[in-house]
C-alpha cells in the first residue's frame, strides 16, 4: 500500500487523525486483499495493549472532570517541529484536543466539499502529513492473533475512558473494498474508543451515552471521510450520506445493529450445533430452547429443515436418550415434533417414581395419532400438538403435557411472588460481531427445585395443545360435561369437568380470552403456547416476556427451576360456582397391562402365542382385552434378540435384483476347491471357478497351490479375457473370506488397479456364497462320474472338471430357457466336435523312433483344447497329454480302452453319424489342399494365404487345365483315400466354405473352359464373362469392388497358357481357402435381406455393368425390401461419382512384379493391401491423385525407409520404459492462473482489478451458499490428515471476455477413503446431444440454453472433510469444515448429479432416458444436462419457460439464449458454435475457438504461405529407428504432443470426424515424439488451422418422411503384417445428418479382410441400438435402422444360415453373434460402393481428390 499525504489540503492540521503506512514498510507487490478480519482483530489487540500501558494523572491531563463529557479540552502543547505529529509522527491522546480540533470549527465550516478525495492513494512526499507506526508497536498485519474477539464497552466504561490517557492512538486502516466495510467499522469504533470518544458510540438502542459536541462531530466526519473513501463504501452507507453527508452517527448505529443481528445468528447456529441433553433438565425446557432457535434462524433466512434439526438434536442426546440415535436412524421423514415426543416419553418415565407414572419405557418407534406442526406466522413459532385423532368417529381428544395427580402438588393460588433477582448473562462472541452489550434474563433465584411448582403462576407449555387449570374461580362461561377427551404423553385419559374461557388483563390494559379446560387431575396449571399464538401472543424467551406481534410487551416470564411461568395476577376472576363445576363424575378408566410386562412374565413368548392362549382361556385371571397390544407388533425385546439370535434367512430369488442391476460379466462369483491329496506333483491340487451372475457362464482354472501370486495370475487372466473377448468390465467379484481372497496383494489389485469392488461373505454365512458353492459341488459330481465311467486315473480329475464346464455352459437352464453361451452371445456348442470323456482314440506319432515303428499311439480324449482347434488327449504309454488334431476315433461299443476287444470291432453308427459333417468338412478341405499341391507356382502359396487372404482368386486345379486334366473318377477315389488319412486341417477356415463349393463336381472337372464364373472375394460377387483360356489380347478382367486400400489392385482372371507358356497362377479368396468356383446360393435369406449390387448371372457384359450401376437380383420377395433399403441410402450425404469408361488392360506380364517382392505397410498407421499383385489393368493416376500439397522441406520427411506409423514393436526403443513413467509425472496443461499470478504480481492494472472483482464475487457466493462452517476453525493437529483437502483460488478469462475466479479443492490429491469410488459424475454423452440437435432441426424445436451458477454448491456433502484456507489469507494452521460439494472434490460431480436429477424428476416432472444419463424428457420438453449447462428442446416455447420458472425457484438460473427468434440464432453449446435457423438448417463449427487456441500452441503455421488440402499424405511412413534423446528433451516433446493431440482430439470428436483417423494414429505415438512424428502432427494442426472455418452442415429432413432413419456406415482397413492390427471406422447418421464417428484399431487380430469388416460392423451395432432407443424415446415416430458396408462377402456371412461358416473359434463366434443381432434388432444390411463409402476416411489416408470427394457433402 502506497503512502498518502494531504498536502493539497492545508487546512487539515495536526489535529487530524489520519493513518497510513510509508512506502518503506510495505513490499512493492503487497496483496491488496491481505487485510482480512483476523488481521484487523490482531491490530485491535495490539492497539489496545499499547494504549492501556500509558496513563496520566488528572492533574497532568487536559481531560475535564465532568464524567459525562468525554470531549478533549484545549491544552498548551508545544508546536510541532517537522510536521503536525510529534513522537514519531504518532498522534498522542493530549494532541487530540480542541487546540487541534478548533481548526475544524463548526461542521458548517468544513474547509472542503464532502467526498471529493481522489480514490487513489496520495503519492508519497518528503513531508508526509500522515502518522507512521513506531517500530516498537508494529504494523496492524504483524501482531499475533488474539485469543478472543474484541468487545466494545457501554456507558459503564465511559468514565474509565476519560481517566485513561493513551500516549499513542493508532489510526484505523484504509477501507479498500465495500465487502470489508463491516470489519473496518469495528476498527474505526475501536479507534474512537482509544480517542476517548467511546461515550458517543451508539448503544443497542441506537442512542449514544452522552450527546456529541460539534467539535467531536467534525472530528468524526473528517476521520471517517479520510479512512473510508467514497468509492469503497457500501450502497446503504452511500444512501445515508446522500441525505446528510455528516450523519456518521446513523452509519455507526446501523452498523452496530447489523453486527448484533449477525452475532445472534452465529450464536444460534453454534448453540444448535453443540446441543447436549441427558434428562437433567425438563424436556419441555429443552424443546422450547431448540424450537426458539430454529424459529429465529428460519425467520432470518437460514432454513433448518427437519432432517438437519433431528440429526443435530440426536447427536447431542446422551444417557437414557442415546438409544434414540439408533432406533430412528431409518426414519427418513421424521420431524422435530416426533423426536420430541420420544424425548418427552423417556423424560416422563424417568420422573415416574415422583409423579406415579408407570415404570416402563414407551417405544419411540410407536405410531402416534398426533403430530407437531409449526404455525405459519411471522412471529416466533410455537410448537403445538394436533388435537385431532386419526379416527374421526371418536370425540375430540386434546393432549396435555406435564400431567400429574401427585398429592404433593400445591393448590394455593398466590398471585404474588418475591422480587426475582436477575443475573446478567454475557454473550460470548467469538467473531467480535457485537459491541459488548449485556443482556439480562429474568430468573428466580431458585435452582434446586426443578420439579416444584411456582405458586400463583401458570406453567408455559409448548407441547400442550389445550390450556388446563385446576382452580375453577378463573373460568368464565363454564359448561359442564364437555365432550372432550384429553390424554397425556402416555395416552392416558384425563377427566375433564368443564370447559370455559380464561381472561387476561395484561400490562397494556387490554383483555384477551382463550379457551380453558378444568380438571383437578394435573400437577400444574398449564398455559398452552399454541392457544396464545392463536390470539397473536408469543413467548419471547430471549427477552423473557409475553408480547404481541407488533412488539408490545404484555407480561414478564419467570424462570423457576427448569420451567417458565406467567403470574396468575393477570387472570380475571369469575363469579361461577365452584361446586357446580366440580360436581362431575370422574371415574377413572381401567388401566391395561402393558405388553412388555406380559411378555416378560410369560417367559418371553411371542405375541401370537400369548394372544392365542388368552383367547382360549389357557391362562386365567385376565382376558385378552386387559392387555395393551398397541406396541406388540413393533416391540423388540433386547433379551429375546440376544438369547434367540439366529442366522438370517436366505430368501429364494433374493439375487434377482443383482441380475437386473448388472450387465453380463459385471458381477462374478468365485470360489476355490481343494486340495485333492495323493496326486503326482504335475497334477493340480486345486481349481478356482468363476460364475457370471447374469449369464451363468463358468470358467475354471487349475491351481497347484493357493499362494497370493498364483491367485493373482488367475484373476489377471480372467479379467483380461472378459475385457477383450466380451468388451465388458468386471465391477464386483463376490468371494468368501479365505486368506487367498483377503490378502493385501489381491485387494490392491482389484480396488486400486482395476476399480473392482470385492464383495465378501459375512462371518459364518456360507449360504450367501451359494452360487459358487453349488457350481463346485456340481462340477465335482460330474468329475467323479466321468472318472468312474472312463476308468481314467484320478490325476486327470481337472480334465473332467474342464470337460464338464464346457458342457454345462452349453446346457439350457430350466428358468431362462437358454444356455450360458446363448446368454453370453455365443453360438451353441457344436456337438460334432465333441467326444465323450475318455473316448479311446489313436493319435498319430509325428516323430517315431524309426521308420518301421508304429505310427499310432493309443490314447483317451479328454476335452477340446482351450488354446487351439485340437483336442486334449491322454497317452498312457507316454504318461502325458497332447494337444493334437491327428487322431482317429476307435469306434466300438466299449468305452474304456482296457475293455476294448480289437477282434470284435463294430461300427458305432451313432458316433459316426454325429461326427459325419465334421469329418466331411475336414476331408473336403484336405481334398482341396491335396489338389492344390500339384499346382506349380513361382511363390510360396501358403505364405500367400496368410499374408493376402483378401485378394480375390480363382483357384484353378489341374482338372480345368488342358495339359493336365484329371477324370472325375480320379477325384472320387482321391476323396475316399484322403478322407481316411490324418492330414491336419487348415488353421483358418474360410467362412464361405461349404460342401457345395469345395467338393469337386463332374461338370466342372470335365469342362475345359468356363464361360461364367463368380468369385467371392472381398468385394463380393463379380460376374466374369471371360473364357479362362482365352488369349490375353481378348481377355477382360474384373475390378475388385473392395477398394478400401490406398491403391487399387486388379487381377487377371485367366491366362492363355498357349501364348505365355506360364503355369496358371492361383488367386486366393477371402480367408485363405482355395475355391475353384463360386458356391451355390442356397440360403433363401440371401435373396431376401441383401441388396445385391453385382450383376445377375444372365446379365449383360461387364462393360455395361460398371460399379456405380445398381442391379439388384430380381426375386419375388425382394421388391419391398429393396425399396426400404434404397430409401435408407437415398438421403445420405454420399459423393456423386462420374461415369467411368471401359478400360483396356495392358499386358499383365509387363507390369507383374515378382510374387515375393518386398511388402510395405500403408501410411499413417493403416496397413493396406500388399503389392504382391500389382494392378494388372491399372493406369497412371493423374497428378491430382498423387498430389498432397504437403511438401515442406524437412530432412526427416524422406521415403527411403517407408514403414508404418505404428509404434515399433520388434525393436527395443530407448527411453520407452522411462517414457511410460515420465508421462505419469507430466503435469496437465494449465489454462488458469493462480492467485499470485492474477492479483499479487499482475502488472496489468485493469486486468488485476477485474480479477479482484471476480475474487470478491466468488467469496460472496461461497458465503451465500453456506459452503463451509463459519462458526468454528479447527486446528490442523486435531484432524485426521487424510480428511484434510488443500484448496486454492484459480482465475481465468472466459471466451466472452469476463473474468472468472473459482475457489476449488485439490481433488487430485484427495485420499480414497474420503469419497465413494462407486459414485458416478454423469454428463450428457456427445451422441445424445447431437441426436437431440438433429431431432430439433427436423421437428422445428425451440432450443433454449441455460446456466446454473455455482451448481456444485447446491449439493450437500456427506463425508466429514476439512479444507485449508487459501495461503494468502494467513491461516496456515487452521481448517474449516466443508458443508457443500466444493468444486474439485471427487464426489462433487456425483453429488450435484444426484441433486439436480432428483429435482428434475420430482419438481419438473421429467424422467431420465434409460441408458442415456443426463438426458431427461417429458411429453413436451427434452433436457440435456452437462454439469451446470442445460439445453432445452421443445416445440412449444412456453413449455421451456415453465421449466425455467421451476428451476429458478431452487437454483440461480441464467438464460443464456432463450431461442425465440425465427431468424438465425447463434449458440455456444459445450464448445460447439452452432448457427440454427428453425425449420431450415443447422451449422456446427468451432472457428472462433480454434482461432483463439491454435496460435497459443506455438506451432509454425503456414510455413510456405499456402493452405493444405488434406491432413496427411498417403505413402509417407514413420521411421522406426531408435529414439535417442536426453530425458529433459524427451519430456518436453511428449508434453508438446499431449497439447497438440489433446486439442485435435477435442475438435475431432466434436464435429471434425474426417480427422479422426489421423488423430487416432498420431495419438498412439505420443510416447514416441520423433522429429518425423512431430512434423506430421504439425501438418495436422496446420490443416485444422487452414480449415478452421469448416462446419458440419445439416439440413432439415423432408417433411414427407414417415419415419426416422438411423444408419451406421462401416469400413475396415485390414492389417496384414505381423505385430499390427486392422483399423476400423464407423460413421453414424440420423435422417441423413452425420451425428458421430469413430476410428480405432481393432481389438482382435483379424486374419482376413472379411474378418476385419465383420469386426467393424459388430463394433457399430451396440451403439446403433442404443441410439435407436434414444431416438424412439425422444421422438415417437417409427425408426428404420440400417448397416452399410462395402464388403459383399461380409453381408453374405451375416445373412446366411450355413453353420459351416462359423467354424473359426473367434471369428465364427463374432460372426454368429452379429448375425443374431442383425436378425433380432431388425437391421437392414445394405451394400455401398467403396467409392461412395464415406467411412473410408476413418480407416486410411486418402489422396486429396478422394478425400474431398468423400467429405465435401457433409462438412465444408
Swiss-Prot record:
UniProt signal peptide: none
Annotated compartments: Cytoplasm; Nucleus
Residue ranges of every copy of the Reverse transcriptase Ty1/copia-type domain listed in the record: 1339-1477
Keyword Protein transport listed: no
Catalysed reaction, written as an equation: DNA(n) + a 2'-deoxyribonucleoside 5'-triphosphate = DNA(n+1) + diphosphate; Endonucleolytic cleavage to 5'-phosphomonoester
UniProt region (Integrase-type zinc finger-like), positions on chain: 583-640
Binding site residues for Mg(2+) 3: 1611, 1653, 1686
Domain (Integrase catalytic) ranges: 660-836
This protein's domain notes: The C-terminal RNA-binding region of CA is sufficient for all its nucleocapsid-like chaperone activities. Integrase core domain contains the D-x(n)-D-x(35)-E motif, named for the phylogenetically conserved glutamic acid and aspartic acid residues and the invariant 35 amino acid spacing between the second and third acidic residues. Each acidic residue of the D,D(35)E motif is independently essential for the 3'-processing and strand transfer activities of purified integrase protein.
Region Disordered, annotated ranges: 1-93, 126-173, 352-421, 957-1088, 1093-1112, 1131-1188
Site (Cleavage): 401-402, 582-583, 1218-1219
UniProt PTM: Initially, virus-like particles (VLPs) are composed of the structural unprocessed proteins Gag and Gag-Pol, and also contain the host initiator methionine tRNA (tRNA(i)-Met) which serves as a primer for minus-strand DNA synthesis, and a dimer of genomic Ty RNA. Processing of the polyproteins occurs within the particle and proceeds by an ordered pathway, called maturation. First, the protease (PR) is released by autocatalytic cleavage of the Gag-Pol polyprotein yielding capsid protein p45 and a Pol-p154 precursor protein.
Coiled coil: none
Binding residues annotated for Mg(2+) 1, in chain numbering: 671, 736
GO terms of biological process kind: DNA integration; DNA recombination; proteolysis; transposition; viral translational frameshifting
Gene3D superfamilies for this protein: Ribonuclease H-like superfamily/Ribonuclease H
Compositionally biased region (Low complexity): 153-165, 402-418, 961-970
Subunit structure of this chain's protein: The capsid protein forms a homotrimer, from which the VLPs are assembled. The protease is a homodimer, whose active site consists of two apposed aspartic acid residues.
Predominant place of localization: cytoplasm
Keywords, comma-separated and alphabetical: Aspartyl protease, ATP-binding, Cytoplasm, DNA integration, DNA recombination, DNA-binding, DNA-directed DNA polymerase, Endonuclease, Hydrolase, Magnesium, Metal-binding, Multifunctional enzyme, Nuclease, Nucleotide-binding, Nucleotidyltransferase, Nucleus, Protease, RNA-binding, RNA-directed DNA polymerase, Transferase, Transposable element, Transposition, Viral release from host cell, Virion maturation, Zinc, Zinc-finger
Natural source organism: Saccharomyces cerevisiae (strain ATCC 204508 / S288c)
EC code: 3.4.23.-, 2.7.7.49, 2.7.7.7, 3.1.26.4
Binding site for Mg(2+) 2: 1347, 1428-1429
InterPro entries the UniProt entry points to: Aspartic_peptidase_AS, DNA/RNA_pol_sf, Integrase_cat-core, Retrotran_Ty1/copia-like, RNaseH-like_sf, RNaseH_sf, RVT_2, TYA
Protein name: Transposon Ty1-PR2 Gag-Pol polyprotein
Amino acid at each position: 500500500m502506497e503512502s498518502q499525504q494531504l498536502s493539497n489540503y492545508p487546512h487539515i492540521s495536526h489535529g487530524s487523525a489520519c493513518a497510513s503506512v510509508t512506502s518503506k514498510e510495505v513490499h512493492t507487490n503487497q496483496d491488496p486483499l491481505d487485510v482480512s478480519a483476523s488481521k484487523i482483530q490482531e491490530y485491535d489487540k495490539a492497539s489496545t495493549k499499547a494504549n492501556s500501558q500509558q496513563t496520566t494523572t488528572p492533574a497532568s491531563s487536559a481531560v475535564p472532570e465532568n464524567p459525562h463529557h468525554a470531549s478533549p479540552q484545549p491544552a498548551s502543547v508545544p508546536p510541532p517541529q517537522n510536521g503536525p505529529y510529534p513522537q514519531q509522527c504518532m498522534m498522542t491522546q493530549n494532541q487530540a484536543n480542541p487546540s487541534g480540533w478548533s481548526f475544524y470549527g463548526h461542521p458548517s465550516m468544513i474547509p472542503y466539499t464532502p467526498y471529493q478525495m481522489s480514490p487513489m492513494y496520495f503519492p508519497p512526499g518528503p513531508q508526509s502529513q500522515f502518522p507512521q507506526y513506531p517500530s516498537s508497536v508494529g504494523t496492524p498485519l504483524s501482531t499475533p492473533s488474539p485469543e478472543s474477539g474484541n468487545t466494545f464497552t457501554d456507558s459503564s466504561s465511559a468514565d474509565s475512558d476519560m481517566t485513561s490517557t493513551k500516549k499513542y492512538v493508532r489510526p484505523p486502516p484504509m477501507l479498500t473494498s465495500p465487502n470489508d466495510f463491516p470489519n473496518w467499522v469495528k476498527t474505526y469504533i475501536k479507534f474512537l474508543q482509544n480517542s476517548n470518544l467511546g461515550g458517543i458510540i451508539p448503544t443497542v438502542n441506537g442512542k449514544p451515552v452522552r450527546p456529541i459536541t460539534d467539535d467531536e462531530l467534525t472530528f468524526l466526519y473528517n476521520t471517517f471521510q479520510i479512512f473510508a473513501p467514497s468509492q469503497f463504501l457500501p450502497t446503504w452507507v452511500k444512501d445515508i450520506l446522500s441525505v446528510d453527508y455528516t450523519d456518521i452517527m446513523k452509519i455507526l448505529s446501523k452498523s452496530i445493529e447489523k453486527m448484533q443481528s449477525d452475532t445472534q445468528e452465529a450464536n444460534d447456529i453454534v448453540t444448535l450445533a453443540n446441543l447436549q441433553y441427558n434428562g437433567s433438565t425438563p424436556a419441555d425446557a429443552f424443546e422450547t430452547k431448540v424450537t426458539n432457535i430454529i424459529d429465529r434462524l428460519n425467520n432470518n433466512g437460514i432454513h433448518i429443515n427437519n432432517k438437519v434439526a433431528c440429526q443435530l438434536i440426536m447427536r447431542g442426546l446422551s444417557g437414557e436418550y442415546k438409544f434414540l440415535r439408533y432406533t430412528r436412524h431409518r426414519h427418513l421423514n421424521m420431524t422435530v415434533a416426533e423426536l420430541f415426543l420420544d424425548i418427552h416419553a423417556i423424560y416422563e418415565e424417568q420422573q415416574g417414581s415422583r409423579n406415579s407414572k408407570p415404570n416402563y419405557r414407551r417405544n419411540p418407534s410407536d405410531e402416534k395419532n398426533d403430530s407437531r406442526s409449526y404455525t405459519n406466522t411471522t412471529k416466533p413459532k410455537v410448537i403445538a400438538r394436533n388435537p385431532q385423532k386419526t379416527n374421526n368417529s371418536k370425540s375430540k381428544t386434546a393432549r396435555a403435557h406435564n400431567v400429574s395427580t401427585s398429592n404433593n402438588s400445591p393448590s394455593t393460588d398466590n398471585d404474588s411472588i418475591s422480587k426475582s433477582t436477575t443475573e446478567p448473562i454475557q454473550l460470548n462472541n467469538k467473531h467480535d460481531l457485537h459491541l459488548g452489550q449485556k443482556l439480562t434474563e429474568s430468573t428466580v433465584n431458585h435452582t434446586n427445585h426443578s420439579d416444584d411448582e411456582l405458586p400463583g403462576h401458570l406453567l408455559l407449555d409448548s407441547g400442550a395443545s389445550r390450556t388446563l387449570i385446576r382452580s375453577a374461580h378463573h373460568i368464565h362461561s363454564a359448561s359442564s360435561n364437555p365432550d372432550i377427551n384429553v390424554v397425556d404423553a402416555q395416552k392416558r385419559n384425563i377427566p375433564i369437568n368443564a370447559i370455559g374461557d380464561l381472561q387476561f388483563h395484561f400490562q397494556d390494559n387490554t383483555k384477551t380470552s382463550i379457551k380453558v379446560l378444568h380438571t383437578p387431575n394435573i400437577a400444574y396449571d398449564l398455559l398452552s403456547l399454541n392457544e396464545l399464538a392463536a390470539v397473536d401472543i408469543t413467548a419471547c424467551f430471549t427477552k423473557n416476556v409475553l408480547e404481541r406481534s407488533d412488539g408490545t410487551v404484555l407480561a414478564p416470564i419467570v424462570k423457576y427451576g427448569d420451567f417458565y411461568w406467567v403470574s396468575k395476577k393477570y387472570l380475571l376472576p369469575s363469579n361461577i360456582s365452584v361446586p357446580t363445576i366440580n360436581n362431575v363424575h370422574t371415574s377413572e378408566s381401567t388401566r391395561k397391562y402393558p405388553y412388555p410386562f406380559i411378555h416378560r412374565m410369560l417367559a418371553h413368548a411371542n405375541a401370537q402365542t400369548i394372544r392365542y392362549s388368552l383367547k382360549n382361556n389357557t391362562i386365567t385371571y385376565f382376558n385378552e382385552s386387559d392387555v395393551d397390544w398397541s406396541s406388540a407388533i413393533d416391540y423388540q425385546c433386547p433379551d429375546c434378540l440376544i438369547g434367540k439370535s439366529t442366522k438370517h434367512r436366505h430368501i429364494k430369488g433374493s439375487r434377482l435384483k443383482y441380475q437386473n442391476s448388472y450387465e453380463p460379466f459385471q458381477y462374478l462369483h468365485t470360489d476355490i476347491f481343494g486340495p485333492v491329496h495323493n496326486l503326482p506333483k504335475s497334477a493340480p491340487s486345486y481349481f478356482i471357478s468363476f460364475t457370471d451372475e447374469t449369464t451363468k457362464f463358468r470358467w475354471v482354472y487349475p491351481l497347484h497351490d493357493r499362494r497370493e501370486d498364483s491367485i493373482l495370475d488367475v484373476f489377471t487372466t480372467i479379467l483380461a479375457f472378459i475385457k477383450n473377448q466380451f468388451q465388458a468390465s468386471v465391477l464386483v467379484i463376490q468371494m468368501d473370506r479365505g486368506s487367498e481372497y483377503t490378502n493385501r496383494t489381491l485387494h490392491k489389485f482389484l480396488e486400486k488397479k482395476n476399480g473392482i469392488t470385492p464383495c465378501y461373505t459375512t462371518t459364518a454365512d456360507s449360504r450367501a456364497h451359494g452360487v459358487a458353492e453349488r457350481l463346485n459341488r456340481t462340477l465335482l459330481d460330474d468329475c467323479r462320474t466321468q472318472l468312474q465311467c472312463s476308468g481314467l486315473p484320478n490325476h486327470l480329475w481337472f480334465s473332467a472338471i474342464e470337460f464338464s464346464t464346457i458342457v454345462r455352459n452349453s446346457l439350457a437352464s430350466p428358468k431362462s430357457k437358454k444356455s450360458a453361451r446363448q446368454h453370453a452371445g455365443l453360438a451353441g456348442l457344436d456337438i460334432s466336435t465333441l467326444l465323450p470323456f475318455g473316448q479311446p482314440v489313436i493319435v498319430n506319432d509325428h516323430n517315431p523312433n524309426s521308420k518301421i515303428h508304429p505310427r499310432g499311439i493309443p490314447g483317451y480324449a479328454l476335452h477340446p483344447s482351450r488354446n487351439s482347434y485340437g483336442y486334449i488327449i491322454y497317452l498312457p504309454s507316454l504318461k502325458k497329454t497332447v494337444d493334437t488334431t491327428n487322431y482317429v476315433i476307435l469306434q466300438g461299443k466299449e468305452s474304456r480302452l482296457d475293455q476294448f476287444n480289437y477282434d470284435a470291432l463294430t461300427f458305432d453308427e451313432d458316433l459316426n453319424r454325429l461326427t459325419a459333417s465334421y469329418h466331411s468338412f475336414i476331408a473336403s478341405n484336405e481334398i482341396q489342399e491335396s489338389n492344390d499341391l500339384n499346382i506349380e507356382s513361382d511363390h510360396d502359396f501358403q505364405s500367400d494365404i496368410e499374408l493376402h487372404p483378401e485378394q480375390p482368386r480363382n483357384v484353378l486345379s489341374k482338372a480345368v487345365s488342358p495339359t493336365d486334366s484329371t477324370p472325375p473318377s480320379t477325384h472320387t477315389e482321391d476323396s475316399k483315400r484322403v478322407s481316411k488319412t490324418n492330414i491336419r486341417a487348415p488353421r483358418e477356415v474360410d467362412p464361405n466354405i461349404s460342401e457345395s463349393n469345395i467338393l469337386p463336381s463332374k461338370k466342372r472337372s470335365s469342362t475345359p473352359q468356363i464361360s461364367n464364373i463368380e468369385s467371392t472375394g472381398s468385394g463380393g460377387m463379380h460376374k466374369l464373362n471371360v473364357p479362362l483360356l482365352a488369349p490375353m489380347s481378348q481377355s477382360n478382367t474384373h475390378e475388385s469392388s473392395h477398394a478400401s486400400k490406398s491403391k487399387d489392385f486388379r487381377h487377371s482372371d485367366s491366362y492363355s497358357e498357349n501364348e505365355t507358356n506360364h503355369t496358371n497362377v492361383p488367386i486366393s479368396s477371402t480367408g485363405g481357402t482355395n475355391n475353384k468356383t463360386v458356391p451355390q446360393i442356397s440360403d433363401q435369406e440371401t435373396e431376401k435381406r441383401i441388396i445385391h449390387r453385382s450383376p445377375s448371372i444372365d446379365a449383360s457384359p461387364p462393360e455395361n455393368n460398371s460399379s456405380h450401376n445398381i442391379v439388384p437380383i430380381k426375386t419375388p420377395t425382394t421388391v419391398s425390401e429393396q425399396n426400404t433399403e434404397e430409401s435408407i441410402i437415398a438421403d445420405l450425404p454420399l459423393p456423386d461419382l462420374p461415369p467411368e469408361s471401359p478400360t483396356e488392360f495392358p499386358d499383365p506380364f509387363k507390369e507383374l512384379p515378382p510374387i515375393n517382392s518386398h511388402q510395405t505397410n500403408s501410411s499413417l498407421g493403416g496397413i493396406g493391401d500388399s503389392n504382391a499383385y500389382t494392378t494388372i489393368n491399372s493406369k497412371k493416376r493423374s497428378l491430382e491423385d498423387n498430389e498432397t500439397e504437403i511438401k515442406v522441406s524437412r530432412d526427416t520427411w524422406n521415403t527411403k525407409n517407408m514403414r508404418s506409423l505404428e509404434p515399433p514393436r520388434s525393436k527395443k526403443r530407448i527411453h520407452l520404459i522411462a517414457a511410460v513413467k515420465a508421462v505419469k509425472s507430466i503435469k496437465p496443461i494449465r489454462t488458469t492462473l493462480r492467485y499470485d499470478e492474477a492479483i499479487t504480481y499482475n502488472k496489468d492494472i485493469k486486468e488485476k482489478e477485474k480479477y479482484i472483482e471476480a475474487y470478491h464475487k466468488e467469496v460472496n457466493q461461497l458465503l451465500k451458499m453456506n459452503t463451509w462452517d463459519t462458526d468454528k476453525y479447527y486446528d490442523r493437529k486435531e484432524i485426521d490428515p487424510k480428511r484434510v483437502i488443500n484448496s486454492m483460488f484459480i482465475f481465468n478469462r472466459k471466451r466472452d471476455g469476463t473474468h472468472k475466479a473459482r475457489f476449488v479443492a485439490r481433488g487430485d490429491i484427495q485420499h480414497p477413503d474420503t469419497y465413494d469410488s462407486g459414485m458416478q459424475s454423469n454428463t450428457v454423452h456427445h451422441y445424445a446431444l447431437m441426436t437431440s440437435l438433429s431431432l430439433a432441426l427436423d421437428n422445428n424445436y425451440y432450443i433454449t440454453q441455460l446456466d446454473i451458477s455455482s451448481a456444485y454448491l447446491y449439493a450437500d456433502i456427506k463425508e466429514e472433510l476439512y479444507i485449508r484456507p487459501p495461503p494468502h489469507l494467513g491461516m496456515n494452521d487452521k481448517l474449516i469444515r466443508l458443508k457443500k460439494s466444493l468444486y474439485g472434490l471427487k464426489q462433487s460431480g456425483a453429488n450435484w448429479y444426484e441433486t439436480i436429477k432428483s429435482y428434475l424428476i420430482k419438481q419438473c416432472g421429467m424422467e431420465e432416458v434409460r441408458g442415456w444419463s443426463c438426458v431427461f424428457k417429458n411429453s413436451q420438453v427434452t433436457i440435456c444436462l452437462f454439469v451446470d449447462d442445460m439445453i432445452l428442446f421443445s416445440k412449444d416455447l412456453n413449455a421451456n419457460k415453465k421449466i425455467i420458472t421451476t428451476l429458478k425457484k431452487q437454483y440461480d438460473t441464467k438464460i443464456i439464449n432463450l431461442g425465440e427468434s425465427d431468424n438465425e440464432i447463434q449458440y455456444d453449446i459445450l464448445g460447439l458454435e452452432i448457427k440454427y435457423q428453425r425449420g431450415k438448417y443447422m451449422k456446427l463449427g468451432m472457428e472462433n475457438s480454434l482461432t483463439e487456441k491454435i496460435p497459443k500452441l506455438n506451432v509454425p503455421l503456414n510455413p510456405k504461405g499456402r493452405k493444405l488440402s488434406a491432413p496427411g499424405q498417403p505413402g509417407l511412413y514413420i521411421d522406426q529407428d531408435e529414439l535417442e534423446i536426453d530425458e529433459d528433451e524427451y519430456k518436453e516433446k511428449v508434453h508438446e504432443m499431449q497439447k497438440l493431440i489433446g486439442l485435435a482430439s477435442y475438435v475431432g470428436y466434436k464435429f471434425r470426424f474426417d480427422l479422426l483417423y489421423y488423430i487416432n494414429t498420431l495419438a498412439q505415438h505420443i510416447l514416441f515424439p520423433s522429429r518425423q512424428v512431430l512434423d506430421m502432427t504439425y501438418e495436422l494442426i496446420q490443416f485444422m488451422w487452414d480449415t478452421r472455418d469448416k462446419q458440419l452442415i445439416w439440413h432439415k429432413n423432408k417433411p414427407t418422411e414417415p419415419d426416422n432413419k438411423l444408419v451406421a456406415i462401416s469400413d475396415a482397413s485390414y492389417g496384414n503384417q505381423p505385430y499390427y492390427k486392422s483399423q476400423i471406422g464407423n460413421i453414424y447418421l440420423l435422417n441423413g445428418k452425420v451425428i458421430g464417428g469413430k476410428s480405432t484399431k481393432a481389438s482382435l487380430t483379424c486374419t482376413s479382410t472379411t474378418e476385419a469388416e465383420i469386426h467393424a460392423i459388430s463394433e457399430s451395432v451396440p451403439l446403433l441400438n442404443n441410439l435407436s432407443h434414444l431416438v424412439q424415446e425422444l421422438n415417437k415416430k417409427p425408426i428404420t435402422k440400417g448397416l452399410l458396408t462395402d464388403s459383399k462377402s461380409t453381408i453374405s456371412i451375416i445373412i446366411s444360415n450355413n453353420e459351416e461358416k462359423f467354424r473359426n473359434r473367434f471369428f465364427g463366434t463374432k460372426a454368429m453373434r452379429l448375425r443374431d443381432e442383425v436378425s433380432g434388432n431388425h437391421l437392414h444390411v445394405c451394400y455401398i460402393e467403396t467409392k461412395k463409402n464415406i467411412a473410408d476416411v476413418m480407416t486410411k489416408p486418402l489422396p486429396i481428390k478422394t478425400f474431398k470427394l468423400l467429405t465435401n457433402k457433409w462438412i465444408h
